[in-house]
């Protein structure tokens, strides 16, 4: 698992390979990831937008942004957690993702919360160090 803490908001990511949706013979590799967002602050916050920076093993970058996550803009009161799952397809057997959420505190202040970088590695992937 991967974790980041920004402004007392903790983001935990657990990626997993989706073998049943992947087809290596057709250069299709799919991962799921589970995210848990925990509000350790003393104010309510709402997740407004998301931004993802996705890089495959060839260095090809894809940037994804939009409102909320999975169609929601969840409100997290102090002590609350919010969990969701989503996925990411790549044309290569490995890659890396990171990003941020834009949050709005109950007083109207907006700030970004880091999504930690996490690796997407196919099972059985052999790495060579030169």
From Swiss-Prot:
Record domain ApaG: where: 3-127
A Pfam family of this chain: DUF525
NCBIfam families assigned to the protein according to its UniProt record, in alphabetical order: PRK05461.1 (NF003967)
Protein name: Protein ApaG
Organism: Sinorhizobium medicae (strain WSM419)
Gene: apaG
